[in-house]
Amino acid sequence: RGSHALPVISIGTEEQQKEIKKAQKYAAVGCWNTAADLFHTQTRTITDSAELWHSVGLCRAWDGDEVQAAEALHRAAQLYTDFPASVECETLAQLFDRFNTTDLIDICTYEAKVESVGRLLTLLDEQPRFLRFDVPKQTEGEAPPPVAAFQILDRPQINGPDFSQLSLDSIPKFQAHISVYDADQEAGEPASLYLTGDRGVDLEEARSLLESAAAGCISWRTDKTQPEVTGAVPAEAQPLRWTWSLPKNLPITRTRDLRNQQWKRIFSETWPNASLKALGGKSPTEAANDPRHKVALAAAIYVLDGHCQQQNHNLDLAAYLAKFGVESLPPLEVDESTQLNQLSVMQMHRLPIEKLSDPQLVSVVNRALLTRHEGFLYKALKVAFTRPACEEHMDLQRCLRAMVELCAGDGRRDEALQYVEIARGKPSQDVSQFEYQWNWDMTELALRLEDPSDPALKPLLDRFVHYYSPKVPQMRGYIEQMLSTYGVPSPWESISIVTSASASVTSAVWSPNAPAPAASPSKLWLPGE
């Protein structure tokens, strides 16, 4: 998915070129450590070749040596005079640096013996700051899961139904995690409790609260190191983490609004003022005034973009680069001979999408579906959908589904619904028409439920009751579960299922343009009516 081609190295003597070609051949057959050593040997005499250091870095990375890969790529970034190549090398180096640092926050676990699991769970369930959640069922071949799990919050959960006072500063935050296990008779282990969280004030406060709540029911183990370090997270990543505990019945639109507010705070306050090792300890705001940090700052913004993508958030990259006075990487020049499959992800994102030929665009769309950078995928699909010749060679249903997900995830519900309608008009030959329409009606239902007052929700639910329910009666429970999540009453409670006399109305396969079946005198009640 992230192809990286070794750069062309055209400098050096005839003997040096022979060694460089040998290194390239080793790299081509997967002998990356040997190739890296050969490339590195040449840097002792050709000290100022960005391409050589770039090659060393890629081979070290392919061989799994991220520390030396980062060192070589940092060096290549310093030597390149080509700004895009420099930024790409520096971006890779910073990505490798993230988890190869001593500046870490330990994830710690305390272990305690439990006198009575039943009594303990009763005590914990009574605590307003202890939020119990479901644990996965045991699967064959895996260790038994905990009998119960809790989050310890910094304040009691808000259960609504009025969430008007919920804000970024009032949302309950996660302090620690509790797992409770039954005794293991075969191993001779007693019932146990594990308390896990980031080392610091929050974890110790959670531990004190647990000791108070479960007094006489647990005892910390003295035969083991307490706490045990079970993991770590980079300290620089801490400002980008947030540990919310949102109410289960919080409307999805409100959840999305709060997430967008949090991202806005990160982009405008948190990240611009955070000290970054890649910037010599300076913050992005400070580094923006120092031309020596131009490449490193641009790379740091691309690393931030990668983090946003992991969290399903789309950063307006061009605007954010401009905010710090950094120029966007220029579009690539392409022609019919350009080997698009050899481009790195960052290079692919620089393609002039509108200028690509139809076959090139199809190739880019297929790859973008794998790499799943939301901003780039949306742009590529948007153009592809305007070209009928492209649609013939794309996995159209997958592309339409992806477009709906992109729009919905970004809060563009109306646009997502438009693509649902487009999809209905482009039936698949791989499934029956009934199944095809059912799938897209379910997609529409999920979107409509984001706003229970949507007037189009009633006729859609009527369709499920009168058309789908007689044919697939087992789907009722699933639909009702969806509705209950959004506080919408079951339509089966207020709309009569069609009788045999009206069965002819629904005997034909439903189509989007067909009139809805006649409903009984009773109607669906929705909040606000």
Positions of the model-derived regions?
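Alpha-helical segment of the N-proximal tetratricopeptide repeat
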Residues: I9-T45, V345-K379, V383
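"A position-specific structural signal for the A-helix of alpha-solenoid helical repeats
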Residues: E14-Q17, K21, E51, S55-C59, ...
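Boundary/linker segments of alpha-helical solenoid repeat arrays
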Residues: T47-W53, Q78-L92, T222-D223, A389-R398, ...
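Alpha-helical linker/edge segments of TPR/alpha-solenoid repeat scaffolds
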Residues: A61-A72, F83, Q94-E115, E405-Q418, ...
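Short Lys/Arg-enriched alpha/beta "domain-start" segment
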Residues: E90-Q175
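Short acidic, low-complexity intrinsically disordered linear motifs used
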Residues: L279, S504-E529
